[in-house]
Structure formats: structure tokens, C-alpha cells
């Protein structure tokens, strides 16, 4: 598996879960690392991690903070060329799962006429010119299959990237849920704000970036808190917009009501202990945290952002949907959800059968079939 990345994201965790499941079944899995991918996952299985460049070299590149992260990744990929070529020659019978923006490995798989089976997993909502180049180059590979995580991406990929060969395109959900998540969600939360039974806790989880649109969530919560003073908003995650969000919280006089807890090792217990989960993103794939929240039993609201969340909650069957980037619509939905807790719990219960498709065992089996057949 190779998925060059600056920092560990949900997509990397998806690939790692697939790798771990296949490894547990006796398959030999190797993770080829260029950047920070799989940095935050615990490797307690037989999966071999291979750093194509020394970790110290990549950390050195990250020191130059004036460099755009994309430039850092380009430099890292250049340094990884010779080690990757050596790996190709030593592992001619290997198959490859490529993720995120794998233009670097694809070029050398083509140049050296590698006939291995290759699966290119397309995640999120690809919009960049670089991704267009990835698609164009991937078509030169002789034995490639494409995977997308939900049906909604089919039309998008076809229309935006001249993708006519839908026969090579498979829909396989991401590996999001497993027994460990359910078990960890049952752990006790120590923070005092979760101990007050008179408080109603709303939660948002994710990187503090423009994509996640936490500023809209805070503005909507500001309106809600006027109606329901007992409400508390908890936000888990770090990111470049943290200072901006803190200033917004201060300007709205919400410093006692909005709690930024940063990155936590076990977000699941916080979601399980909350009354309502909100995903306010401007764009998403299927929405991993949305799936996690539903999977552990927390009622959910999501924006109708492109391209996957609406499909994840089945057009509102499993939660509430609000207009993308609309403060007022989100405020109304939060009010509605808290006023109808029994209905919201019913929606969660109705999602249980559908959520099974996101369990790692099922997802890994589907990927394995692509390589076997």
C-alpha cells in the first residue's frame, strides 16, 4: 500500500484497517511510507512499514515552515524515487493499493512496465488539476481498477474527469467501524463538562480547517444557546483555524459555552457521551466521523455538502440534513433535534443494519476480491 501524505488523515486510517484485516487473514502486507502517513496508528500486527526515505529526512523538510506542504511532499517524493525503484525490482509479484494522490508511484509502475494488479482508491471530493493528472496517468497502467467510497461520486468522476470506463470503477465503502471503536466509546469521560447531567452537549469533531466549517457551527450554536442556555458545544481537533475560531468564540461571548479540547486519542467516548453530533463541513467524502457517530449511537446532523454525507444518512432517514453553509438552517435543525430526542434516537436505531457495510471485515473482503478476480 502506498498513499503519500503530509499528516495522518481518516483516509490513511481506512487503508490501515484494511491492511490489518488482510494481514490477520495471512496475507503479506507492506506499507510504503514517504511522509507522515500511518504515523498515528499503532502497528501491533505483522504489517511491515517501509520508510522509502528516513523519517529524520522528512522531519527535516518539515522544519522549513515557509515551504508549502505540497512542496515538502514533492521534495520527499523525489528523494524516494531510487528506494521505490529498488522496491519494485525486489517485489515484482506484488500487487498495489494506491491512495490519495499517487502520481509518484504510478509513473514508475508505468516506466518499468509493472504488470501487477493495481487498485487506485479515490477518496474525498477530488477537485485539483493534480488529480486530473493522476487520472490521466493511471489510464496508462495495464491492470488497474478504481474504487470510490459511495455511489454519489460516480457521476462526479465521470463528468469532471472524462472517466468513461465505468466497468473498472467499483463502489466499496471505507473501513470506518470495528469492535474496538464500539468498546472504546464505552469508556468514561473525565472532563467536568460531561459530568453535569443538567447540560445538553453538542459535539463537532475534525481538523480545524476551512473545509470543516466550524465557524458556521459556532455561529449557529450562538443562536441556539440563546434559546437553550443549558447547551454546551464541544469541539475536538486541531488545525490552522484554531486562533480564528477562538476569536469568534470570544466575540460572541461564548468562552464558557464552547470548549476546544484539541486532538484526543479516543474521540469515540466523547461522541457517545454527547446528545447530538454535528458535521458542518463544506465538502466531504462519506464523512468518517459521521459514520463513527452513528455507529456508536449518537444522533447526527450533517450539511448537504458534496458529495457523500447525504448518502451516508440515506437522505435524512438516519439523521437531519441542512443546507450547506447556512447558519440559520443549522440552528433550526439543532433546535428541532433537541426538541425531538426520541425521534432522533429512532433514526439512529434504524441505521444499524446499513452501518454494517462500513465494518472493516466486509470492506477488506471486497478489496481482496478486486485483487483475486
Predicted regions and their residues:
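A short, active-site helix/loop in glycosyltransferases that binds the activated sugar's phosphate group
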Residues: 144-171, 176-180
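Aromatic "clamp/platform" in nucleotide-sugar-dependent glycosyltransferases that forms part
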Residues: 263, 282
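N-terminal strand-loop element at the rim of the active site
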Residues: 1-9, 13-15, 21-71, 162-163
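Short hydrophobic beta-strand element within catalytic cores of glycosyltransferases
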Residues: 299-303
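Conserved acidic donor-binding segment of nucleotide-sugar-dependent glycosyltransferases
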Residues: 315-327, 336-341
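Conserved donor-binding/catalytic core segment of Leloir-type glycosyltransferases
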Residues: 195-212, 218-221, 281
Amino acid at each position: 500500500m502506498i498513499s503519500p501524505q503530509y499528516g495522518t488523515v481518516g483516509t490513511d486510517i481506512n487503508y490501515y484497517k484494511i491492511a490489518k484485516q488482510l494481514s490477520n487473514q495471512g496475507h503479506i502486507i507492506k506499507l510504503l511510507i514517504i511522509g507522515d502517513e500511518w504515523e498515528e496508528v499503532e502497528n501491533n500486527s505483522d504489517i511491515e512499514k517501509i520508510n522509502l526515505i528516513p523519517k529524520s529526512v522528512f522531519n527535516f523538510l518539515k522544519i522549513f515552515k515557509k515551504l508549502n506542504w505540497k512542496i515538502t511532499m514533492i521534495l520527499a517524493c523525489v528523494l524516494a524515487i531510487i528506494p521505490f525503484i529498488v522496491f519494485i525490482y525486489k517485489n515484482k509479484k506484488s500487487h498495489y493499493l494506491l491512495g490519495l494522490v499517487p502520481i509518484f508511484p504510478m509513473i514508475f509502475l508505468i516506466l518499468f512496465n509493472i504488470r501487477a494488479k493495481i487498485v487506485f482508491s479515490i477518496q474525498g471530493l477530488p477537485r485539483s488539476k493534480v488529480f486530473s493528472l493522476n487520472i490521466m496517468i493511471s489510464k496508462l497502467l495495464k491492470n488497474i481498477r478504481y474504487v470510490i467510497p459511495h455511489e454519489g461520486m460516480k457521476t462526479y468522476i465521470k463528468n469532471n474527469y472524462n472517466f468513461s470506463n465505468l466497468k473498472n470503477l467499483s463502489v466499496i465503502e471505507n473501513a470506518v467501524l470495528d469492535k474496538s471503536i464500539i468498546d472504546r466509546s464505552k469508556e468514561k469521560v473525565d472532563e467536568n463538562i460531561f459530568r453535569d447531567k443538567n447540560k445538553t452537549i453538542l459535539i463537532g469533531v475534525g481538523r480545524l480547517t476551512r473545509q470543516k466549517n466550524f465557524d458556521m457551527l459556532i455561529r449557529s450554536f450562538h443562536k441556539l444557546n440563546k434559546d437553550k442556555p443549558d447547551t454546551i458545544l464541544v469541539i475536538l481537533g486541531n488545525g490552522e483555524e484554531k486562533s480564528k475560531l477562538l476569536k469568534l468564540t470570544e466575540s460572541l461571548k461564548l468562552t464558557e459555552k464552547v470548549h476546544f479540547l484539541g486532538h484526543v486519542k479516543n474521540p469515540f467516548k466523547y461522541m457517545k457521551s454527547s446528545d447530538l453530533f454535528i458535521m458542518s463541513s463544506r465538502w466531504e467524502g462519506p464523512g468518517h466521523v459521521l459514520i463513527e457517530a452513528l455507529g456508536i449511537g449518537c444522533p447526527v446532523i450533517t450539511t448537504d455538502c458534496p458529495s457523500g454525507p447525504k448518502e451516508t444518512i440515506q437522505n435524512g432517514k438516519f439523521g437531519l440534513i441542512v443546507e450547506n453553509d447556512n447558519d440559520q438552517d443549522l440552528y433550526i435543525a439543532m433546535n428541532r433535534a433537541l426538541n425531538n430526542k426520541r425521534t432522533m434516537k429512532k433514526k439512529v436505531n434504524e441505521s444499524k443494519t446499513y452501518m454494517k457495510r462500513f465494518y472493516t471485515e466486509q470492506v477488506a473482503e471486497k478489496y481482496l476480491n478486486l485483487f483475486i478476480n
